[in-house]
Amino acid sequence: MNERTPARVAFVGGGNMAGALIGGLVRSGHDAAALVVVEPAEAQRERLAREFGVQAQPAADERLAACGTVVWAVKPQLFAEAAAPCARFVGGALQLSVMAGVRCATIAAASGGARIVRSMPNTPALIGQGIAGLYAEPAVSEGERAAAAALFAPTGQVLWVAREADLDAVTALSGSGPAYVFYFLEAMMQAAA
């Protein structure tokens, strides 16, 4: 485990991207018992607990308050619903988002936090070969930036951008780029057959 990786991390949402981050942390030596996942779907909770040994629970509670970092990993359209019961526990935490299109101002308004890092990892992150664009709000310290980068490092490369709007360009390139490569390779294989 990287010494800059946050010790206790809560994930709100337990889907594919949360699984990629959790898997990367556990594989790099992070203590699975220090990871808390709030996921309403029972099958997802059971999978994460079985696969990684994390604490997976159906709803937010005081265990989130013990985490210095929270990762918002829900579908963007479900963020407001997910944030409401979590806000009283996570306002003082460093908050990271892997939600496409949800701006830092929206996260701050819903969670009460100001230290927010927004990210846009791409699908190859699921196999540790991704690229994650990260943007940090001004309230995020250099140490917190390093902690955020350390959390994403096991999933691939980390690229910091200066403006939140720049994440859209990173998303267009890193998010769509692999799909075009896979499509191109598939077409080449079909042509060769």
Model-identified regions with their sequence ranges:
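NAD(P)+-binding Rossmann beta1-loop-alpha1 motif at the extreme N-terminus of oxidoreductases
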Residues: M1-A59, A193
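Phosphate- and divalent-cation-binding pockets in alpha/beta enzyme and binding domains
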Residues: A20, R47, E81-A82, T106, ...
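Rossmann-like NAD(P)(H) cofactor-binding subdomain of soluble oxidoreductases
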Residues: E42, F52, A60-L134, P138
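Internal alpha-helical scaffold of NAD(P)-dependent oxidoreductase catalytic cores
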Residues: T106-R115, I131-A169, F182-A193
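Aromatic-residue-lined binding/catalytic grooves and analogous aromatic/hydrophobic interfacial grooves
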Residues: G177
